[in-house]
Structure formats: structure tokens, C-alpha cells
UniProtKB/Swiss-Prot annotation:
Gene3D superfamilies: 3.30.30.170. Heterotrimer composed of an alpha, a beta and a gamma chain. InterPro entries: IF2/IF5, TIF2_bsu_arc, Transl_init_fac_IF2/IF5_dom, Transl_init_fac_IF2/IF5_N, Transl_init_fac_IF2/IF5_Zn-bd. The keyword Protein biosynthesis applies. Keywords: Initiation factor, Protein biosynthesis. Belongs to the eIF-2-beta/eIF-5 family. It holds the Pfam family eIF-5_eIF-2B. Coiled coil: none annotated. GO terms for molecular function: translation initiation factor activity. eIF-2 functions in the early steps of protein synthesis by forming a ternary complex with GTP and initiator tRNA. This is Translation initiation factor 2 subunit beta. The keyword Aminoacyl-tRNA synthetase does not apply.
């Protein structure tokens, strides 16, 4: 039985696609636990989220601050947002952060690290496919 190049390429692509789907299913970032105190929103498991994403908590806090137009403070394991923010908004902003700063734009896997080159210039280095991609977001 002979295969041509394109049939083999298509078979390999389909198998790789299935593997990527399985890997994406196994990766579930923690759900933010939120408390409201007066006019403040507190993400109580913020450090746990940052550790799971393998990102510096200061970068995540800066992202939230810029996106929500409000001051944020890291205190212990929590992030304090000086504004009342709904759970849906926080979840949406966390998903945006993950898509911009965590997921590899080439292979769509989360096995990455964030590298800072120069002032405010970030790259995502993927441990799965080996690519380095610039982050198209200015903190």
C-alpha cells in the first residue's frame, strides 16, 4: 500500500490535532474565588492562579489594573481590586490574560514561560514546540 506525501501529511495532522485536543482538556486553570468587602473585590486564590499559570503575580495584577482602569494591590495570597467587579468580568479578563500571555500562539499549548526582553517587551517561549513569539500587549 503506497501513500503519497499529502495523504501522510494529512494523517499526521489529524493525529496531532487529536493529541492537542486531549492536552487542552487536561489543562484547567483554577477558578477565581471572589469576596466583596465594601467597594473592593478580592481574589482570594490569586497566588494559586499565578503559580498554576507559571506567571509573576505582579504581571497579572498589572494586567487587571490596566484592563479594569483601577488600582490593584497584592496582599498575601490575594489580589485586592479597588472597585466592585463582577465574577463574570474577572473570569473574562483572566481568560484574556491566558490567551495573551500564557497560550502559545503557534501550537496553542499552555506549556510556556514569559521572557522579558528590554523594557516592557515580552516574549512567550513554548516548551512544547520551541517557538518564541512576541506578546502583542503593552503593560
Amino acid at each position: 500500500m503506497e501513500y503519497n506525501y499529502f495523504e501522510l501529511l494529512e494523517r499526521a495532522y489529524q493525529k496531532l490535532k487529536d493529541v492537542i485536543k486531549q492536552e487542552q482538556i487536561r489543562w484547567n486553570p483554577p477558578i477565581p474565588h471572589i469576596e466583596y468587602v465594601k467597594n473592593r473585590t478580592i481574589i482570594t486564590n490569586f497566588k494559586q492562579i499565578a503559580n498554576y499559570l507559571n506567571r509573576d503575580p505582579k504581571i497579572i495584577a498589572k494586567f487587571f489594573s490596566k484592563e479594569l482602569f483601577v488600582q490593584t494591590i497584592i496582599e498575601g495570597n490575594s489580589l485586592i481590586i479597588n472597585k466592585r467587579v463582577s465574577y463574570e468580568t474577572i473570569k473574562k479578563k483572566l481568560d484574556e490574560f491566558i490567551n495573551i500571555f500564557v497560550i502559545c500562539p503557534v501550537c496553542k499549548r499552555p506549556d510556556t514561560e514569559l521572557i522579558e526582553r528590554g523594557r516592557k517587551i515580552y516574549y512567550i517561549k513554548c516548551h512544547a514546540c520551541g517557538s518564541e513569539s512576541p506578546v502583542n500587549y503593552e503593560l
